[in-house]
Amino acid sequence: MIEFRNVTKTYDTGTKAVKNANFVIDKGEFAFLVGSSGSGKSTLIKLILKEEEPTSGNIIINGKDTTFLKQSRVPYLRRSMGVAFQDFRLLPDKTVYDNVAYAMYIVRATPRHIRRQVPMVLSLVGLSGKAKMYPNELSGGEQQRVALARALVNNPSMLIADEPTGNLDPDTAWDIMNLLNDINMRGTTVVVATHAKDIVD
């Protein structure tokens, strides 16, 4: 599903964010990218999403070498992935329902499909009763659940979560990790970038 072959990323400043990375994440796995702040975790995610290009090496996603993928094909690559960011990136003027539905509008899903899929994924993340609320009315853990719901709503084969527990208290952090485990048990490949080694252990 994801394979890095001798991948190096060096920025124009000379900073080597990733050096000779070699790893494989198979379909259905739950994988962690672990390291302190500035260790290259976010760069790895950007490379997977093709937001950054490797300086050298090859990146294979779902059996396709993305190294020379045309820019016009990148949106199609990303449709196989759901991404939840540390800062949530929720739309403040839209309800929970509309924040999640927005990801479906972008891929031109039918209104009927949206009406069916959004309540289903909100139920999965435990937010059925919060659909009409706005982000500023939610706790940090609830906002993270909205971000996860939005990442999952288009049924991606892979979920990438960048520091999903970074802004949360310990109890809420474990709730989110349990949710990610449940998502993985349903067959979705899960990749979590984190600095919290206790969560990995």
Where would I find each of the regions flagged by the language model?
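Helix-to-loop junction immediately C-terminal to a conserved catalytic motif
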Residues: 49
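A short, proline-enriched helix->beta-strand linker immediately N-terminal to the Walker B motif
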Residues: 153-157
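Short coil-to-helix segment of the ABC ATPase nucleotide-binding domain corresponding to the Q-loop/switch region
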Residues: 94-101
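Conserved ABC transporter NBD signature motif
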Residues: 57-65
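Catalytic Walker B motif of ABC-type/P-loop ATPase nucleotide-binding domains
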Residues: 159-162
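Hydrophobic anchor residue at the start of the ABC signature
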Residues: 148
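Conserved ABC ATPase signature
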Residues: 133-138, 142-144
